[in-house]
Amino acid sequence: MIGSASDSSSKLGRLRFLSETAAIKVSPLILGEVSYDGARSDFLKSMNKNRAFELLDTFYEAGGNFIDAANNCQNEQSEEWIGEWIQSRRLRDQIVIATKFIKSDKKYKAGESNTANYCGNHKRSLHVSVRDSLRKLQTDWIDILYVHWWDYMSSIEEFMDSLHILVQQGKVLYLGVSDTPAWVVSAANYYATSYGKTPFSIYQGKWNVLNRDFERDIIPMARHFGMALAPWDVMGGGRFQSKKAMEERRKNGEGIRSFVGASEQTDAEIKISEALAKIAEEHGTESVTAIAIAYVRSKAKNFFPSVEGGKIEDLKENIKALSIDLTPDNIKYLESIVPFDIGFPNNFIVLNSLTQKYGTNNV
């Protein structure tokens, strides 16, 4: 029988308010969707259902309650397995489920004819996606529904009105958005708050110590609207590996799997991995991924990194990041390895005012 998350002494069990506009309480780490892969083992981590359930059990027993999915991930297997796990453990009221809509694998299953409306930000795509997600997740409601990305075709009014209807119906509780330009999210939230609609409460996007584009417009936008941030790729898609770990992988014939296929680390990834390993040693651990997670958590409040631990031991290492507090010198050192240009106009007239308001670590 699975234990109770609320009894856990782990820091993962110290639940926090999601954001200023969403008072739901969630764990400080999100168990990411890639972890449940079985259908797309050609380029992602392969995992059968039993192993996926063991991973979910470990996350919950350690105190975690925040789980991420998407309507199309792993040929829809992600939502199906999460739904089966929640039902088998009778945990629906304890788990916060986040899922996404815009793209559906039905487009590819059904062929190219008469399938255009399976994708996009429009009302029909949203209706079909949520209908199917509720069925696969075996639930009556979705805690957080993300717009997966902006399709550059639908109007802001159409998709914000359509999302608000789902909230009114009780099928969705909170709204999120991912991988979408800051100007679109700003316009959408302005429209929502101006006309009595439900605004976005959380933003999910790519961010890590090596790729810091998130800091240009996304973080300031989230601050302005009181949104939470859920960065993905925090661990560099598995490419932040110490020299020792890479040697062990080569010895075992393991490559680095990612969306671009198996390959070696780039020079920048090697440099940042060595820097992470150096800081890890200072904090009494060998885990570079724990330091990578601790780095993004140190930048601001209301950050909920998504972790993709394919193995239980990896997940446990990731959870240890919650006990690591990086010093200002640690952060300064990591950010010096691969310099980041915040870009115009932030590196021109407004840089000094941003530094004064938020501090150098947050600019």
Swiss-Prot record:
GO terms for molecular function: aryl-alcohol dehydrogenase (NADP+) activity. It is an enzyme of class 1 (oxidoreductase). This is Putative aryl-alcohol dehydrogenase AAD3. Its EC number is 1.1.1.-. GO terms for biological process: aldehyde metabolic process. CDD domains: AKR_AKR9A3_9B1-4. PANTHER family: ARYL-ALCOHOL DEHYDROGENASE AAD10-RELATED, NADH-SPECIFIC METHYLGLYOXAL REDUCTASE-RELATED. Keywords: Oxidoreductase. It comes from Saccharomyces cerevisiae (strain ATCC 204508 / S288c). Belongs to the aldo/keto reductase family. Aldo/keto reductase 2 subfamily. It comes from the Eukaryota. Transmembrane segments: none annotated.
